């Protein structure tokens, strides 16, 4: 497992996308030494990190990515993720947007780029199979974000597993004592199974 500490505000789009792309190239270039299966590179992101992961999965093949990384057309295909795990992701810049995420992501290019980062409209046949979970009562990033993305995945015939848990606040992580700290509201036993479900998904496909 590798963790990317990507640039946030004041850095703006597409800085983090390019950092993620460079990270994938580094991982694949060192796959043998690091004992990594090159065909099992899975992106996982939560909340705004979910937007980054899903965004990259949608645009990895676009010229602005390969140009930004200064790589050849052939090397472009080394960027393709094999799978995607999204936890309560920010997806849409439309009616159900988490607006502050897009203000920070786009900075002074907000009006110019807002529509292009509404990911339910960016899904294409090159997006990998995807696992998504969200809670019905998420008050920060509405569940519609995951529903919109899953609907777009289905429309593009992308294999998808979607779990909507009945209750729980935003940012639950593992939804247990390990990640809740002093926040009792982040201990939600009904949501804990997401990790085992994601593990089963990984074992089955990868």
Which functions belong to the PLM regions below?
Residues 2-38, 188-190:
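Catalytic nucleophile-loop/oxyanion-hole region of alpha/beta-hydrolase
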Residues 5-9, 90, 166-168:
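Short beta-to-alpha linker loops that shape the active-site pocket of alpha/beta-hydrolase fold enzymes
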Residues 126, 131-134, 138:
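Short beta-strand/loop motif that positions the catalytic acidic residue
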Residues 136-139, 167-169:
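Acidic beta-to-alpha connecting loop that harbors the catalytic carboxylate
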């Amino acid at each position: 497992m590798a963790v990317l500490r990507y640039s946030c505000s004041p850095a703006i789009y597409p800085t983090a996308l390019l950092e993620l792309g460079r990270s994938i190239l580094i991982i694949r270039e060192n796959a043998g030494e690091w004992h990594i299966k090159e065909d099992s590179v899975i992106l996982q992101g939560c909340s705004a990190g979910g937007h980054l992961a899903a965004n990259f999965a949608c645009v990895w093949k676009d010229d602005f990515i390969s140009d930004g990384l200064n790589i050849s057309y052939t090397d472009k295909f080394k960027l393709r993720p094999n799978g995607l795990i999204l936890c309560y992701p920010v997806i849409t810049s439309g009616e159900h947007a988490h607006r502050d995420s897009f203000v920070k992501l786009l900075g002074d290019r907000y009006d110019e780029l807002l529509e292009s980062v509404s990911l339910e409209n960016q899904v294409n046949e090159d997006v990998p199979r995807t696992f998504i979970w969200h809670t019905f009562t998420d008050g920060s990033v509405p569940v519609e974000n995951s529903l919109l993305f899953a609907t777009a995945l289905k429309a593009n015939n992308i294999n998808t597993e979607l779990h909507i848990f009945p209750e729980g606040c935003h940012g639950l992580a593992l939804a247990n004592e390990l990640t809740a700290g002093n926040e009792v509201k982040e201990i939600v036993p009904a949501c804990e199974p997401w990790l085992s479900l994601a593990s089963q998904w990984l074992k089955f496909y990868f």
